[in-house]
Amino acid sequence: MLFMVIERYKDKEAVYKRFREKGRLMPEGVSYVSSYVSTDGNVCYQINECESEDLLHMWAANWEDITDFEFIPVISSREMSKNGKRK
């Protein structure tokens, strides 16, 4: 299942420092797909794939001190237009 993850940074310098030092810190079972960052660098819009939102909460626990998270299950617009609904 795909998830749009919206990360709102409380302290972007701390986020980028931790990322450089430790990487994404994602648990096994979560696959990073792609991400885009707002031009001010304070918000990241990320697509991840995993079987359960619970895995995303495990990942977020490594960052919650400096980032607020929102998880939204998503499907491609192509899939939606073909099927009219989520499988």
Could you say what each language-model-derived stretch is?
Residues M1-V33, V37-V43, E51-M58, I75-K87:
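Short S/T/G/P-rich N-terminal loop/turn motif that feeds into the first structured element of a domain
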Residues E49-C50, N62:
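Conserved catalytic core of Hanks-type protein kinase domains
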Residues W63-E70:
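A common structural junction motif
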